[in-house]
Amino acid sequence: MIIDTTEVQAINSFSRSESSKEFYGLIWLLVPIFTPVSGILIGVLVIVWLEREISAGIQQRIGPEYAGPLGILQALADGTKLLFKEDLLPSRGDIRLFSVGPSIAVISILLSYSVIPFGYRLIIADISIGVFLWIAISSIAPIGLLMSGYGSNNKYSFSGGLRAAAQSISYEIPLTPCVLSISLRLSNSSSTVDIVEAQSKYGFCGWNLWRQPIGFIVFLISSLAECERLPFDLPEAEEELVAGYQTEYSGIKSGLFYVASYLNLLVSSLFVTVLYLGGWNLSIPYISIPELFGINKTGGVFGSTIGILITLAKAYLFLFVPITTRWTLPRMRMDQLLNLGWKFLLPIALGNLLLTTSSQLLSF
């Protein structure tokens, strides 16, 4: 039997080309998945570094300076330390709830990034109910915290989980009318892309911040409470509950709560940017990014990069508010926190929604 070497070489080259196609196809499948996740995690590292540097400046002390230039890798070093720590489990707790709770908290917050536009059409899911999908998804996170508190079989953890659930319900409700005021009157849409586009004509003069100042204040307070930042960190009050629902956690599970806290803070800042600060627009009246740089509105690498930079710049500038608030205001009592949400913010938010809808009816 005579073997044709030409045919063998052709078969080998064909198999190699098919293998390379499968390999590159797998890479292109994973790139859209890992790119947003990597960007989000880098954003969290920047937030941690900013908070430590700003906190050090407020307290007149030296912040992190040894891990990398200016201590920017300190958060990465802390995460690596938690990754290699022993993962302890409570002997009398519910192990399934104890293990699933942190994952639910992180996943629900990560899903919120799918409706955040970083540029023109630079969004994972541009759907007509984008902002309300975010509100619905973010309400899942307290369920994970409650599961963590209950599964720990610890009175401090369970009290922290109950506080987290009560706080989330109390401040989700005032936050919703603020979003409705923008969707019904100012943009006539619940799509986050449409909301940004509605603010683009007059630059910073067209921001919803000026057209909805009452809603902005209520949204700001409610978002801080949703992030459990001081003065709203009742679920983790160290003086009362040790560490709240995190008391029994160690290792990577403790790190997941740590990451979830900063992920939620970044989500809130990005939604403030999208809803009230004009999103990716340059904020100069009558000047748009495509016209300024002579590029197509639908994007391109340069236009998308400019949009991402503007969005992140606004979000990180806004982060100074929650970071400085942490070192300025004392922690509230639980009754004060609930009274603020139900008796103060909710009536104001509903009144603002009533005024907004009334002005829309009178304009017809």
From Swiss-Prot:
Its main location: plastid. InterPro entries: NADH_UbQ_OxRdtase_su1/FPO, NADH_UbQ_OxRdtase_su1_CS. It holds the Pfam family NADHdh. One of its GO terms (molecular function) is oxidoreductase activity, acting on NAD(P)H, quinone or similar compound as acceptor. Signal peptide: none annotated. One of its GO terms (cellular component) is chloroplast thylakoid membrane. One of its GO terms (biological process) is photosynthesis, light reaction. The chain crosses the membrane at residues 27-47, 98-118, 127-147, 255-275, 301-321, 337-357. It is a multi-pass membrane protein. Its EC number is 7.1.1.-. It is found in: Plastid, Chloroplast thylakoid membrane. The keyword 4Fe-4S does not apply. Keywords: Chloroplast, Membrane, NAD, NADP, Plastid, Plastoquinone, Quinone, Thylakoid, Translocase, Transmembrane, Transmembrane helix. PROSITE patterns: COMPLEX1_ND1_1 (PS00667), COMPLEX1_ND1_2 (PS00668). It catalyses: a plastoquinone + NADH + (n+1) H(+)(in) = a plastoquinol + NAD(+) + n H(+)(out); a plastoquinone + NADPH + (n+1) H(+)(in) = a plastoquinol + NADP(+) + n H(+)(out). NDH is composed of at least 16 different subunits, 5 of which are encoded in the nucleus. NDH shuttles electrons from NAD(P)H:plastoquinone, via FMN and iron-sulfur (Fe-S) centers, to quinones in the photosynthetic chain and possibly in a chloroplast respiratory chain. The immediate electron acceptor for the enzyme in this species is believed to be plastoquinone. Couples the redox reaction to proton translocation, and thus conserves the redox energy in a proton gradient. HAMAP family: NDH1_NuoH (MF_01350). Belongs to the complex I subunit 1 family. This is NAD(P)H-quinone oxidoreductase subunit 1, chloroplastic. It comes from Illicium oligandrum.
